[in-house]
Design a protein with these regions (language model features):
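Extended alpha-helical targeting/anchoring segments
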Residues: 1-516
Length: 516
């Protein structure tokens, strides 16, 4: 049964021009993976977002959708908004300003019957967009082969999985922004989209086989996977020494230097996501299909969150959650705990973490009401499949004249992937890294119709680009936070430790292919 009724929808139309219509289904046999395959396979643009909180507890809601109302893509100076009907609008200038401009005509209505934080925008912004925030930071020039600087999808229908109540909300928005559009016509169009999605969902699953032969990671051993890097170990270690010289000279306290690993892949990119969610479950699991390339994320780290409190009259809560300090997982519980204690007693790791907590406090202080910023969780251990981290949580009350986008801009990029002081660290990154970062160390996530933002730092992420029919190149980038007493070889190994989860996910699929 579809809700609200036409009569209720017509009443809601007096409150806004973008109104949700929904139908509830039992999630008896379907999972987010099977639903994506039924609904989104073959679509030019689609997404699937899932969450494993703290690396161990399944998040309540999963979101997926496809066939967006429009796509907003930034390349260099130009941002294009391409609508589903083929209409294209072109913008120039700061993309951080273009996005709110594109959202301005929408007056969405929210329904208390639906889960919080649904609908809206899904996508990413890449690292090089920092030049629109801080002009003193030089970035590498774009080439035609480079991925977009940013891409966001505005959806008017999506599926929401409730993992607790085991049900699915199929949601479509009635769009009243077209001149002359009646409430009845908008309502019927939304109902038609719901019916089409339900029809796809209720079809038998075809063409998706279990990952038979998939082999889980074997301890902390290096994966048997051939890859190349955009820099040699010697070049990376030389960059570490150069960074340490600048730290000793007082230019910076800390800087993050990265390397990018690439490897060929033959098969379905969605299988990479399926493997990654088994190997490296994380709070920000994401599969983005962007027409001819994919971004597959398993980030453990919040970039920024802006959330309403239970009291509608209260200010939004802004959150950053810096992660800094890493150890590999132990092969036994005792070894794991010993590594955790070693991490918490490591002066280098503690110094790095404290600096980044202070940076997070300062970033929030730029957009939060004075006196509200506080650290409510300090230096706890979070464990993931291949590594453990020191994590802290910093919160504040977003100032009344600031939006979620102001929060993101104030904190972009995260200090945990740049350094401190942030601006000088980014200038040094340009000098010490050989090429563009692209999506790496930027942000991905979603913005909902209640003005809330939930984003992750683009780390532990695969970028998948085509090289031929069913042939792809996968790139994985990882960095190490450098301080005065960093050991070059150890920092190089840390980048490999951070990349290991993604490399293992690829290796596991190779095992499947070899046995088939």
């Amino acid at each position: 049964m579809v809700s609200p009724s036409l009569e209720q929808f017509t009443q809601l139309a007096t409150q806004g021009n973008f109104i949700p219509v929904y139908q509830e289904l039992a999630a008896d046999l379907d999972t987010p993976v099977s639903a994506w395959h039924k609904v989104c396979q073959g679509e030019a643009y689609s997404f699937l977002l899932e969450s494993v909180e703290g690396g161990e507890t399944l998040g309540r809601y999963s979101l997926l959708g496809c066939n967006p109302l429009w796509v907003l893509e930034t390349r260099g100076e130009v941002t294009t908004q391409t609508f589903r009907d083929g209409t294209v609008k072109t913008y120039s200038g700061d993309p951080f300003g273009v996005l709110p401009q594109c959202l301005a005509p929408y007056q969405p209505v929210t329904l208390p019957q639906l889960p919080p934080g649904i609908g809206g925008l899904f996508g990413f912004w890449g690292y090089e967009l920092i030049r629109w925030i801080e002009p003193t930071v030089t970035t590498y020039d774009r080439t035609p082969q480079d991925l977009p600087d940013g891409l966001w999808m505005q959806v008017d229908s999506l599926l929401i999985f409730d993992q607790v109540k085991r049900k699915i909300w199929v949601v479509a928005y009635g769009d009243l922004m077209t001149p002359g559009q009646t409430a009845a016509a908008a309502y019927q169009a939304a109902c038609d989209r719901i019916q089409a999605l339900v029809q796809k969902l209720t079809q038998p699953l075809q063409g998706l086989a279990p990952l038979v032969g998939w082999q889980p990671p074997q301890g902390s051993a290096d994966p048997a996977l051939t890859y190349t890097s955009n820099r040699t170990e010697a070049e990376f270690c030389q960059a570490v020494e150069q960074a340490k010289d600048l730290i000793r000279a007082g230019d910076i306290f800390q800087v993050v230097i990265s390397q990018r690993l690439t490897t060929p892949y033959q098969g379905n990119p969605f299988d990479l996501y399926r493997s990654l969610r088994l190997v490296n479950p994380s709070p920000y699991m994401a599969y983005f299909h962007f027409k001819d390339w994919q971004m597959i994320g398993s980030s453990p780290e919040v970039m920024v969150k802006a959330e309403h409190q239970d009291d509608p009259g209260s200010p939004m809560v802004a959150t950053v959650r810096p992660i800094a300090g890493t150890r590999p997982r132990g092969q036994t519980p005792a070894a794991d705990e010993a590594l955790a204690q070693d991490l918490l007693q490591d002066p280098k790791e503690i110094a790095e973490h404290v600096m980044l907590v202070d940076l997070g406090r300062n970033d929030l202080g730029r957009v939060c009401t004075s006196g509200t910023v506080r650290v409510d969780e300090l230096m706890v251990i979070e464990r993931y499949s291949h590594v453990m981290h020191i994590v802290s949580n910093v919160v504040g009350h977003l100032a009344p004249d600031k939006t979620a986008w102001d929060l993101l801009k104030a904190c972009f990029p995260a200090g945990t992937v740049s350094g401190a002081p942030k601006i000088r660290a980014m200038q040094i990154i340009h000098d010490l890294e050989p090429d563009r970062r692209g999506p790496y160390s930027g942000v991905y996530g979603y913005y909902d119709f209640e003005g809330q933002l939930n984003t992750a730092i683009t780390i532990r992420t695969m970028l998948v680009q085509p090289t031929g029919p069913d042939h792809w190149e996968i790139s994985v980038q990882a960095g190490a936070g450098l301080v005065a007493d960093s050991v070059p070889a150890s920092e190089f190994q840390e980048t490999l430790n951070k990349a290991r989860g993604m490399l293992e996910a690829i290796r596991c699929l190779q095992t499947v292919a070899d046995e088939s």
